[in-house]
Swiss-Prot record:
Name of the molecule in the record: Copine-7
Function comment: Calcium-dependent phospholipid-binding protein that may play a role in calcium-mediated intracellular processes.
Gene (UniProt): Cpne7
Taxonomic superkingdom: Eukaryota
GO biological process: cellular response to calcium ion
Upper classification of the organism: Eukaryota, Metazoa, Chordata, Craniata, Vertebrata
GO MF annotations, alphabetized: calcium-dependent phospholipid binding; metal ion binding
Amino acid sequence: MSGDSERAVAPGVVPAPCASKVELRLSCRHLLDRDPLTKSDPSVVLLQQAQGQWLQVDRTEVVKSSLHPVFSKVFTVDYYFEGVQKLRFEVYDTHGPSGLTCQDDDFLGGMECTLGQIVAQKKMTRPLLLRFGRNAGKSTITVIAEDISGNNGYVELSFQARKLDDKDLFSKSDPFLELYRVNDDGSEQLVYRTEVVKNNLNPVWEPFKVSLNSLCSCEETRPLKCLVWDYDSRGKHDFIGDFTTTFAEMQKAFEEEQQAQWDCVNAKYKQKKRNYKNSGVVILADLKLHRVHSFLDYIMGGCQIHCTVAIDFTASNGDPRNSCSLHHINPYQPNEYLRALVAVGEVCQDYDSDKRFSALGFGARIPPKYEVSHDFAINFNPEDDECEGIQGVVEAYQNCLPKVQLYGPTNVAPIISKVARMAAAEESTGEASQYYILLILTDGVVTDMSDTREAIVRASHLPMSVIIVGVGNADFTDMQILDGDDGVLRSPRGEPALRDIVQFVPFRELKNASPAALAKCVLAEVPKQVVEYYSHKELPPRSLGAQTGEAAASSAP
């Protein structure tokens, strides 16, 4: 066994937008020995290249006095198939506390690669190189990648032990516990290593969290192996005992007894001693299973996506009778409004059982009094603004154009507030049954920016998302304010949005894209936003709602 740190180890996270998530596990062999009296105390730093610069993002724990360390800390990174993501792993002999600073540490070697290379190989071993490309002796680093995008949550575990064997002459043992997953090929993968509890035969280790994928590859009957050691500062830890179990067994025992325990057995002692029973007892004091639901979990659980379309009828679009107008109807060439409307609508309608769209307009003078309206039904039925399918919206739009006078200004806050009222009514049901998408199609920057920011911040607490597609060639720079990608959107009063619910897309950047590519870009953020909302509200998919009551309290949060 390799060395151990004196601290518990928790997963590290590289912050990034939602994508396929990959866990990286690290180990090294034959490291250089930089310490004259003992072995090196290695740790690994992860760097990621961004805009040509190497940025240090995380670091493993320190493994004491080991030239062949197996690190417990896991790096979680986001993987994009379409991009080249350059990573660098640097190994240091660590002096003092392990933080993100390496200036006092001895460099033992580094390795550069791409995340794609690691993912393609799943397990990659490379030599470590010193400065100027020189080999660091026989030193190697191994990186194992696991896709956790489909994981189904994480578990909190809390272990303690009783009456462990005393391995020390002048004091009591300093125990720590290691939890391993047994892989299909029989190999063992370190999942977690607890902190060391000094001078104690009845240790209580700190609770820890681990993903189900890391723990058991989401297979609850997969064998798990727990080993208990007496810590030695020189890395020569004394084996106390072990036991084998499964996550399913843990759950069953914990639910029945509110506590599960196993004999911690040293096989060598069992063979030699006739009356040997165990080297102590390990107790699972707490188990909490936290299910993490995906977008598809909610959709398949019965959550409906209701889409509202809001179309800009301001005068800046140009007279629809003029072929240069953004609203000009050409039977052979759909205008930008229609292209965006159809591309997004055809995707959304698959998630709504009645396939009905609310279709609204803003910025026009409407009959019969031709007063300016910033919230009117384009079918001119204020009692029922819904249209049958996306084709119904197209027909209502084409029929509406000759009947209205394009005017202004470009105010969208009233429509955002209208959809927010529907979403608020849905929120009060306490179920994950309906999520609202507002698609705003506009040819210019909104003129009621303060009111719009206020409306979006309020809406960020509700089950809704806002997608804004900018059509035409206007300067949409100011619209990026509403998209929270560059920082948290705030209301004029300074209140921050709870979630980033706005996606802004200039249509001209996708003018030559296929409808599928356009829809993919426009709707890219929606699945994440749906999951974020229901996760924040701690609402499971409707089909799982019955499992969240007190009956499941022993194995659910």
